[in-house]
Structure formats: structure tokens, C-alpha cells
Regions:
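Charged, compositionally biased, marginally structured helical/coil segments
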Residues: 1-127
């Protein structure tokens, strides 16, 4: 994946690599990139606080944008940490599958980890 991104901008590299991977029908790369981008989206979520989760309709948030939640801006170090965690989870999954005697099933998470590692390395070189 060779997404053009600003120096050190790992999120931009993840996003930039997604469309070419989809066009190439590279399922492993698409899965790795989508998963990492989703993990970043989750990390940006701000806890909803004291908004009621259920109850009377008059307490419900209604209208355009009512379901939107505030987001926080992740630093480049935080983005890198989230992607590194995604790599670690895939390596762990591959190891578990191999330990269960299913080495072929461990190839996919290992390949996804390699995609993300490559982007992490490229982002470090650009920084």
C-alpha cells in the first residue's frame, strides 16, 4: 500500500491506501485498512456522559445531528498506538490459530498485520 500522505500522517496513509486496494480487489489489505480506520474512529469517540440511554421520549435527543457524538482529535502518537494495537491483535490471533493446529487460518491475520506494519514503517520513515 503506497498511499500518498503528509509526513507522519498515518491516518491519511490508511485512507489513501483503501481505494487502490479495493480496485485491486486485495481483500487482505482492504480488511486491514478498514479495521484500522474503524479502530481509530472508535478511539476518537467521546463518552456520552449523562445522556439517558433509554427512557421517556421527551428526554431523547431528536432532530438532525442528534445521533452524532462529539469526537476528539487523536495525536499522531495516539494514531500510531491504535494501529500498533491492531497489529498486535492480529499477530495474537494468528498465534492462537496456529496453536489450535490451524496454521492456514492464521495466514490471513498475519498478512493483515504485515500490511499495517508496512504502513507504520513508512509513516516512521516520513516523520
Amino acid at each position: 500500500v503506497t498511499g500518498e500522505a503528509a509526513p507522519g500522517d498515518l491516518r491519511a496513509a490508511l485512507s489513501a491506501g483503501l481505494v487502490p486496494a479495493m480496485r485491486a480487489r486485495d481483500a487482505v489489505t482492504v480488511s486491514a485498512l478498514r479495521s484500522a480506520l474503524a479502530a481509530l474512529g472508535n478511539a476518537e469517540a467521546v463518552p456520552s456522559g449523562d445522556r439517558p440511554r433509554a427512557g421517556a421520549m421527551e428526554e431523547a435527543a431528536l432532530g438532525v445531528g442528534a445521533a452524532d457524538v462529539p469526537r476528539r482529535e487523536l495525536s499522531e502518537d495516539e494514531v500510531r498506538a491504535v494501529v500498533e494495537q491492531e497489529v498486535a491483535e492480529r499477530v495474537e490471533a494468528a498465534d492462537r490459530l496456529r496453536a489450535l493446529g490451524r496454521p492456514a487460518d492464521g495466514e490471513r491475520p498475519e498478512a493483515e498485520a504485515a500490511v499495517l506494519r508496512g504502513l507504520l514503517d513508512a509513516a516512521r520513515r516520513r516523520a
